[in-house]
Amino acid sequence: MLFLLFGGAVAGLFSGARLAQFSGLLLMLHGLASISAGLFACDPGCNPVEPSRDQMLHNLSGLVMFASLTLANLLRVYLARERLGSAGFSWFSLACLIVSLAVMPMMAAAVESGEAFGLYQRINYGVAAIWLGRLAWILTRMQRAPLAVL
């Protein structure tokens, strides 16, 4: 629910800036996918030979969560300079994006081996959560003193 509210706030904050608004919509999509992933539980072991409908929907929701947050992060690599005037956050966004994408092959290998998928998933999502927290902090500061603290 918080992703929906935050995404809506981001979209509303940048009226007239389509890419910035789109990044907010992506955060909202991430929120909807998070709800969906919670509604559709994993099968025991989370990787059965014949997954249930719930498992497939859970996996699809997880994919949408990853894709929407990754794309929002990618947009902010550009938008941090363009809309926030923050080269630092642009570089931070790029670093988070690289780490998030670098973990993906490890996650894929973990699916094949059946070991440590959750670890890589948490690293990936942890980096995304840190990035999102930093974005929220910057936007909060921007509301108090536009661009002065960035």
Where are these regions (language model features)?
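Hydrophobic, aromatic-enriched alpha-helical segments typical of multi-pass transmembrane helices
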Residues: 1-143
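Short, Lys/Arg-enriched, Gly/Pro-containing loop segments at transmembrane-helix junctions
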Residues: 143-150
